[in-house]
């Protein structure tokens, strides 16, 4: 039985990769990588996101200047059709991932009830 659970997990992984929503994220990501300005903006977003996550994990809040930078970056992203499409595709995929997470972790939640 223990090996069977890994087979199911691998099957789920393949099913996620086959989702049209996953394929759309890949497609848009490739388009971003092929466009220097979109790629640079995406890299800037990732760096900002990592910085903010690090700050939040250490209990810090972004300064007013950093909040302004975040807002400006968000506006640039909204103005870029490829990045906008990427985040929309990510959002559609995240619906599936949230549902899968809820289903997979239900037995663990039962253990703490």
UniProtKB/Swiss-Prot annotation:
Matches recorded under InterPro entries: Com_YlbF (IPR010368), YheA/YmcA-like_dom_sf (IPR023378)
Superkingdom of source: Bacteria
Disulfide pattern: none
HAMAP family: UPF0342 (MF_01526)
Family (UniProt): Belongs to the UPF0342 family.
Protein name: UPF0342 protein Spy49_0636
Organism listed in the record: Streptococcus pyogenes serotype M49 (strain NZ131)
